[in-house]
């Protein structure tokens, strides 16, 4: 029998289309229960992911880690040794993750550059635009496959980000059964209006996902696929704004104390959004109670004014 927290037993004789969880994940769960000969399948009733992602620690054995084992060879620098490459565009390589530690997922890695010490903050405009356009295209390709309930794209950078390798890369992960967007809505991206140019705008969240300082770069979905001059211009502007935001997060926000950051990409309500945030030790309010925190108005105003100056100068 399939089990999940706060679940209700649902007999199979009812039509599955009438169940509250009318989606691909429920169909897969129902089929799995039938194969096991179960008379009932347990249906999750609360909003959010159907269950926690399952991490298989055995599959993480031998995984390189620049934070715990510095000085070890970088697998992304050994291009000739890379396997299961999905797409390539010059130095940019999208491939399956060798260490697929999460069950019922497809974990992939997008290597941004051949330069081990590069980062979004250091790319010249041509390389920056190429990286962002390639990443958005690979993300869309995985979504368009229809093989996953949701597809997540994100970037870890630094020892507190959750990442293990320094070499610049992103991750694109297809979730077979979970809705990675279940707890996310537009409220997490609205707040202080910092900057707008063309169809690209930047905000600071006042209802952040985690806190304390989350900056959002927002543009209409699908721009990266457009060939019209205005689409190319705004896609490049999206990348330029992101670079300026990350530079601010690392070099100026909170006195430039941050050594780590995350980027999280979303498609929501017809928009493509990337959320950038510095990473610190996670607050116990969030760990224990899922309570996010937001900086006070004076701090938000200061950040918005200074960030606006940088965006006007560089994006």
Residue ranges and their predicted role:
Residues 169:
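Conserved, mostly hydrophobic/aromatic
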Residues 37-161, 165, 173-237, 246-315:
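Active-site microenvironments that recognize anionic phosphate/pyrophosphate groups
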